[in-house]
A protein has these predicted regions:
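Active-/binding-site microenvironments in catalytic and ligand-binding cores
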Residues: 2-115
């Protein structure tokens, strides 16, 4: 599941301080819902998946707890989803090339969408 917000394209160059301080994202409830779909990965075009700051009553970065810790679902951040959104692509083959590192908690990846 990939989410396109347009936030990075609209904010990063014009206001990098704002881009680094806040992001639109999913709620705690949405994290649980998405986990129930049992995807291999959930990602977005923002530097985090959950909203920062979180909505009132939500826990910050709860998406990481639910998706990664509880369900083993990968989280993909700062994905370049603009072209997919611009062309109205909703289904595609997703190919992920990753570096061969052992014990890392973060990874630079080389994702490709084929449609």
């Amino acid at each position: 599941v990939l989410l396109h917000t347009g936030y990075t394209d609209a904010t990063l160059k014009q206001n990098p301080a704002l881009w680094g301080a806040s992001i639109p994202g999913i709620t705690n409830e949405a994290s649980v819902f998405l986990a129930g779909l049992k995807p291999m990965a959930v990602g977005a075009d923002t530097w985090g998946l959950g909203a920062v700051p979180p909505r009132p009553g939500d826990k910050i970065f709860y998406d990481h707890v639910v998706l990664l810790k509880q369900h083993g679902i990968y989280i993909l951040e700062t994905m370049n989803t603009g072209r997919l959104a611009d062309e109205g692509v909703h289904e595609f083959m997703f190919v992920l090339g990753q570096a061969r590192l052992k014990g890392a908690v973060q990874m630079i990846i080389n994702p490709v969408a084929m449609w």
